[in-house]
Amino acid sequence: MAKDLSNQIVGVCRFSYAGEGGFASATMEQWALEAMLYDPARMKQRFVLFEQICLPSLAAQTDQDFKLIALIADTMPYRWRRRLKDLMGPYPFLQVCTIEAAGPLNSTRRAFRRGWDRHSKFITGFRIDDDDAVACDYIAKTRAVADQLLKLGWADEDTPAAIAFHRGIYWNMNSQEKPYWELSEIGPLGLASAMVTHNDSLANVYRWNHRKIAANVRTWCDPNDVMFVRTLHGVNDSDRSIPPTAELMEITKAQTLMRDRFALQPIKTLAA
């Protein structure tokens, strides 16, 4: 009998999730965290980034057989929940998952399970932030690699395996003169990384800090193709900066690449 290697691709985006373990929540009381996350001005900006950067890149995927779970806390105000759920119409791959405040592994494990189709033996789970993008062939390439890892036995019921594409563009939205930088990271990022696991595994791509993934699980890396756009805009929840080894890109070339490989409109996004 042929071995069951059925594999489903599911992404999780923690959308202003008021849980434990986030960068913003490290030293904040829960009430203060929620006040900061749900501030109307901040939420409007997060939706602009989500709608102009993250979602268009996923809508342009050459392989549309995937789900994106937007993980939110049950404390999110109704107006923002409603706006997020309204996006499920134009973006059929999007699903909203509401969970009480919890740690990053517990909450994301439950989110991945919400996206599971209940019959695939394996889940290839990727992570993405609401202000980042992946190349239009990201899902297709991730599936091709994941299927090969399963066939080779490098990933199985007991052994997860990570897939990392770590060349991409850093987009400094605050700079008009030097906005675009290209870099092949020395190791996996959280962005454009995924993990192949059994459908009831306790592990997922959020289990370890991205800098430690290769030290804990088998990891397949590709530093060649430009596969992600990471944005810097002054209100990032994490402490982002342009890495010192990144190379400055010519503006027209970068904008063409972002349009062709990511379905992004940089000028329109900046005006939003």
Tell where the protein language model's regions lie, with residue ranges.
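Short, acidic, metal-binding catalytic loop of nucleotide-sugar glycosyltransferases
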Residues: 35, 53-65, 90-91
